[in-house]
Amino acid sequence: MKTLYSLRRFYPVETLFNGTLSLAGRDQETTGFAWWAGNARLINLSGKLLGAHVAHAGLIVFWAGAMNLFEVAHFVPEKPMYEQGLILLPHLATLGWGVGPGGEVVDTFPYFVSGVLHLISSAVLGFGGIYHALLGPETLEESFPFFGYVWKDRNKMTTILGIHLILLGIGAFLLVLKALYFGGVYDTWAPGGGDVRKITNLTLSPSVIFGYLLKSPFGGEGWIVSVDDLEDIIGGHVWLGSICILGGIWHILTKPFAWARRAFVWSGEAYLSYSLGALSVFGFIACCFVWFNNTAYPSEFYGPTGPEASQAQAFTFLVRDQRLGANVGSAQGPTGLGKYLMRSPTGEVIFGGETMRFWDLRAPWLEPLRGPNGLDLSRLKKDIQPWQERRSAEYMTHAPLGSLNSVGGVATEINAVNYVSPRSWLATSHFVLGFFLFVGHLWHAGRARAAAAGFEKGIDRDFEPVLSMTPLN
């Protein structure tokens, strides 16, 4: 079944460094790939490829568990999470574990449990990976036809797609269950400065949920990244989980239609390129979400967003100068615009100065001071609470702008501290990874299309310098 075509013709891109070197019995002569091409040697060995994937999952889960325990071991409850370079504990805290009112950590034991569970799981995955890579059957088709596949088998491929979609849907519903029944999640908008609460009144209205998808990505619109209440987030997961599970069942039960059979390339490398493209999109969306959204990524754990730190600075100095007798409603700044307050293009009262560009920021410490027409002057004069002053001063000095030498905050700010915000780390890393995944998508898509069209011959190797060199062994 697997030898319907010559591997040579199907995988013609070769580089002969040392054709005789054989790793685990899979040499260049039999697979068409040299040792350094890694899992490409396993393209038609479903059992060994399974081992590679399970082992990879084990490495991922091991990192999660080990890094989790590392963060727990270094965690200081007296300092905010974002000052300690943590990237995993904020996620656990956001899910409502170990935190109380205001995002204060009251118990680190759940974090320890999470780390240990991941470590134990990684051992199981690691064993399975090594077993399937070294001892298990090379191919699954003969002994376990349910788990076997041929890359060209369109029906089997969409069945596998369906199984993956169902698993993703179950994952979405796990968050829903946590929010509804298992202790709730952290809500930065809870009255009095954030708390863990169960979500009771889900947003299931399709016009609201899918309205986010139809919004513009710019300015105050912000596409799905603009979501700012947990009811919408959890309701969105109900919709997404349902769509994934129903779509998964659909793909398991049906065969691809003729237009889909014609439109797609049906080979292992093509599926790799589709997956890389999807992961790339995930990375770019995650980048924007963690950078701009302070509901899904509460500022109590991740530090303020860029716009939030900027608005916090304007607010802090408004409070200071108002105490010193300034009339913040009418004071004029160096540009002739309002020094503390001005109007937005649509007429709302907003903070003046350089932070005007961030006038559409929404944050739990600022919203109580807004009225129907933007910031309410009488509330700014009479209603500012001490917790709002404390929080804005804290956020002002923790802007997510880390320079290379890790001086956090605004470069000219004398109160800045030595730190880089986890928002900076998470946004930058996901952007960079998303970009590289996109390049990988283009690369493998190009190769897969060329191979399907039958003209991928690779570089002409007749005059390669390496051919005149002595073999490595």
Curated annotation (Swiss-Prot):
One of the components of the core complex of photosystem II (PSII). It binds chlorophyll and helps catalyze the primary light-induced photochemical processes of PSII. PSII is a light-driven water:plastoquinone oxidoreductase, using light energy to abstract electrons from H(2)O, generating O(2) and a proton gradient subsequently used for ATP formation. The keyword Calcium does not apply. GO terms for molecular function: chlorophyll binding; electron transporter, transferring electrons within the cyclic electron transport pathway of photosynthesis activity; metal ion binding. Belongs to the PsbB/PsbC family. PsbC subfamily. It holds the Pfam family PSII. NCBIfam families: psbC. The gene is psbC. [CaMn4O5] cluster binds at E367. GO terms for biological process: photosynthetic electron transport in photosystem II. The chain crosses the membrane at residues 69-93, 134-155, 178-200, 255-275, 291-312, 447-471. Binds multiple chlorophylls and provides some of the ligands for the Ca-4Mn-5O cluster of the oxygen-evolving complex. It may also provide a ligand for a Cl- that is required for oxygen evolution. PSII binds additional chlorophylls, carotenoids and specific lipids. PSII is composed of 1 copy each of membrane proteins PsbA, PsbB, PsbC, PsbD, PsbE, PsbF, PsbH, PsbI, PsbJ, PsbK, PsbL, PsbM, PsbT, PsbX, PsbY, PsbZ, Psb30/Ycf12, at least 3 peripheral proteins of the oxygen-evolving complex and a large number of cofactors. It forms dimeric complexes. Residues 1-14 form a propeptide. This is Photosystem II CP43 reaction center protein. It comes from the Eukaryota. The lineage of its organism: Eukaryota, Viridiplantae, Streptophyta, Embryophyta, Tracheophyta. Keywords: Acetylation, Chlorophyll, Chloroplast, Chromophore, Manganese, Membrane, Metal-binding, Phosphoprotein, Photosynthesis, Photosystem II, Plastid, Thylakoid, Transmembrane, Transmembrane helix. The modification Phosphothreonine is found at T15. GO terms for cellular component: chloroplast thylakoid membrane; photosystem II.
